[in-house]
A protein has these predicted regions:
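Short amphipathic alpha-helical segments and helix-helix/interface helices
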Residues: 109, 145, 193, 308-309, ...
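N-terminal Rossmann-like dinucleotide/flavin-binding domain of flavoprotein oxidoreductases
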Residues: 287-336
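Flavin-dependent oxidoreductase catalytic cores
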Residues: 1-256, 260, 264-276, 284, ...
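Short glycine-enriched, charge-decorated loop/helix-capping segments at active-site entrances
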Residues: 58, 133-136, 293-298, 356-357
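Rossmann-like dinucleotide/flavin-binding elements
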Residues: 247-279, 285, 320-335, 343-357, ...
Length: 403
């Protein structure tokens, strides 16, 4: 049965934390964290909403902060000057949080301001902190975190959907932060800092804020990244996200279709040194991502196309043919050694889908049926409209908003 921690439990927890810090030191870690946010144990002690204790660990703000203070002090004692001790701390909470509780978070930070070696600042709201680009602008947490450096001399790390080097540099130069916390951007491009340092901004695979990386936590699936298709493959021997084996023949390759898959195949084959022809039926390249970027809030998705085009345009061994629809005979007549079919797919208009695995057979005659492809092409229906969403992901809501 759940119960409140007694004094013995707290002593045991502190012992576990000290031993963990010592193991990190012995393993040559540079930083050891005291994690006081995101609903973990220390968050429960800090909040008056969850800490109902009547002993020295409950009641006043000072008492509710006692365990956090003890862990910081004991961790510093254990690691000595071998490791820095950082505190992950929230300066804001859920949308319904009272102003009094928000003020208390700030008062506590001032009270502990000089105790750790580094402050890693966030807000206690995953929805906003890890917000998708559809709803949250880049650097959207600045208003919550801009005060932190005014109350401590210690280095400060902040987060908040950073993607652009310009935004990152701006916050550092304006004294908002000392370090940028960039988890999703480093998933999209592990070499982001080096590319900024080297001035290779056009080579950065900027995060698009779609959060496909984070969805795996809830679905129990391996991590993925729309911008970085090699993400999650670190287990492979000699794996490197940007180093690909050179070509092993003089074969020529035809890639049919310049959507995301076709562009990535062309980029990778071109990097390997193969002669590549990329044929696209339309004038505009990018396929579905170009169209989806026109939907409300998805403009940043166009980076999937832009990054790959920028890389392809540098390659003298790649030819791009726009407005070049190919039949099967056309493909064979090219005489290439290999063909990559990357023509993608279109949305069906007969109701066939995941939960309805057969076409509708009872639609009224004359019913104006449109697909997401039609909506993205500018065919907006007039009058009352029913949206049948068998995808249950993002498209149904976006089509509704677009209409």
């Amino acid at each position: 049965q759940p119960r409140s921690m007694d004094k013995a439990d707290i002593r045991e927890f502190r012992r576990w934390h000290r031993e963990a810090a010592l193991r990190a030191k012995q393993a040559d870690f540079d930083i050891v964290y005291v994690y006081a946010t995101h609903g973990y144990l220390l968050s429960h002690f800090l909040s008056p909403q969850t800490n109902l204790r009547t002993d020295e660990y409950g009641g006043s703000m000072e008492n509710r902060t006692r365990l956090l203070r003890e862990l910081i002090e004991e961790t510093k004692e254990v690691v000595g000057d071998r490791c820095a001790v950082a505190v992950r701390y929230s300066v804001g909470g859920d949308d319904g949080e009272t102003s009094q509780l928000t003020e208390e978070r700030r008062d506590r930070l001032e009270m502990l301001a000089e105790l750790p070696d580094l402050w890693d600042i966030n807000i206690n709201n995953y929805y906003q902190e890890m917000g998708v680009s559809r709803f949250f602008r880049e650097g959207s947490l600045e208003e919550h975190m801009s005060f932190v450096k005014s109350v401590t001399t210690k280095p400060v790390v902040t987060v908040g959907r950073f993607t652009s080097p310009d935004t990152m540099a701006s916050q550092v130069k304006r004294g908002i932060t000392d370090f940028i916390g960039a988890a999703r951007p480093s998933i999209a491009d592990p070499f982001l800092p080096n590319k900024i340092k080297e001035g290779r901004l056009e080579d950065i695979r900027e995060c698009i804020g779609c959060n496909i990386c984070y969805t795996g936590d809830g679905l129990g699936t391996p991590i993925r990244c729309t911008q970085n298709p090699t993400m999650g493959e670190e287990y492979r021997r000699n794996w490197h996200p940007e180093v690909i084996a050179n070509k092993d023949s003089d074969s020529q390759v035809l890639v049919v279709g310049a959507g995301p898959a076709g562009l990535e195949a062309t980029r990778a084959l071109g990097q390997r040194g193969y002669r590549v022809m990329l044929a696209e039926a339309m004038r505009e390249l990018g396929g579905r991502v170009t169209h989806e970027a026109t939907l409300p809030g998805l403009v940043e998705w166009v980076r999937v196309r832009d990054y790959r085009l920028q890389q392809i345009e540098k390659m003298t061994n790649v030819e791009v043919f726009r407005e070049s629809e190919l039949s099967a005979d056309d493909v064979f007549s090219t005489g290439v050694d290999h063909v990559v079919i990357a023509t993608g797919a279109t949305w069906r208009a007969d109701g066939f889908g995941r939960s309805h695995p057969y076409p509708f057979d009872s639609l009224a005659a004359g019913t104006n049926i449109l697909t997401p492809d039609d909506i993205m092409a500018g065919r907006i229906p007039q009058g009352p409209t029913l949206i049948y969403d068998d995808d249950s992901f993002y498209m149904g809501g976006l089509v509704a908003e677009k209409i």
